[in-house]
Amino acid sequence: MDIRELVHLGRYAVWNAFEGKEIKVPEALKEKYSRNMGVFTTLKTYPEHNLRGCIGVPLPVYPLWYATVYSSLQAAFQDPRFYPLKKEEFDKVLWEITLLTPPEELKVPKEELPEQIEIGKHGLIIEKGEQKGLLLPQVPVEYGWSPVEFLEYTCLKAGLPKDCWKDKETKVYVFSGEVYQEKEPFGEVERVNLK
């Protein structure tokens, strides 16, 4: 797998949206990235590295090529926390792609949850009723959170009280992610070490 192809595919999709052009993905690329996989696209300003958009497909329900196109378009234009990306910003943002493993529910006593979470490896999904929140593995590393803080902030992301992870009705899932980011816009793509 050449992750640069996925970053370029995401950029291509967003550029074509700016231009009002159809997104045509070559059959060879569709075939190469046909495996279903969860993926998130994160856009960051350059050189500040401030979040500019982040949306993805957490479950492996789409082929990787499609999930990359979809998440790139969503991160650029549909993240409700930000105004849609403007054409003049296109060469001032970094593309980051996170490839996800399928989530696994942690079925341990609630008080043991923090010791099951490995910062720098795991991302979290908290689910209670209809409410769900997800934070990628890189988030607690960037903010210096402990496993308990990671659980609390994921609860808040779900719109729930920060200690909801202790409730017996709450489900906690972990997943792993490989993070790849451009060093500079349109530049070399490298794997991000989360440890």
Swiss-Prot record:
Superkingdom of origin organism: Bacteria
Pfam families xrefs: AMMECR1
InterPro entries: AMMECR1, AMMECR1_dom_sf, AMMECR1_domain, AMMECR1_N, AmmeMemoSam_A, Uncharacterised_MJ0810
Residues covered by the AMMECR1 domain: 1-191
NCBIfam families in alphabetical order: AmmeMemoSam_A, TIGR00296 family protein
HAMAP family from the UniProt entry: AMMECR1 (MF_00645)
Protein's name in the database: Protein aq_1444
Originating organism: Aquifex aeolicus (strain VF5)
